[in-house]
Design a protein with these regions (language model features):
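Structural recognition of an alpha-helix C-terminal capping motif at a helix-to-coil junction
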Residues: 38-45, 58-70
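A short, charge-rich alpha-helical start-of-domain segment used by transcription regulators
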Residues: 1-24, 28
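Arg/Lys-rich amphipathic alpha helix in sigma70-family domain 2
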Residues: 55, 66-79
Length: 79
């Protein structure tokens, strides 16, 4: 099942608000822009897949950052 219109709008809002901050964090952890971009995109893919959990979180920005940290950890571990 896909996102409803309200979920899509809310996630887009977080994308535009948080993308560059998340990218900066990922670049500092991964030392490569293309990998950092991939990590941030994976983070938002997960946010879309878990939209109910993400959007009902008491701290959506923190949810995104924690998800990004997990994505980065998995990327580093799989190298």
């Amino acid at each position: 099942m896909g996102l409803n219109e309200n979920q899509r709008y809310a996630i887009e809002k977080y994308y535009y608000e948080m993308y560059y901050a998340l990218l900066a964090y990922a670049k500092s952890a991964l030392n490569e822009r293309s990998l950092a971009e991939e990590a941030v995109q994976d983070t938002f893919r997960i946010a879309c897949a878990k939209a109910d959990d993400f959007l009902s979180s008491s701290n959506p920005n923190g949810w995104l950052l924690n998800t990004l940290k997990n994505v980065i950890h998995n990327m580093i571990r799989s190298r």
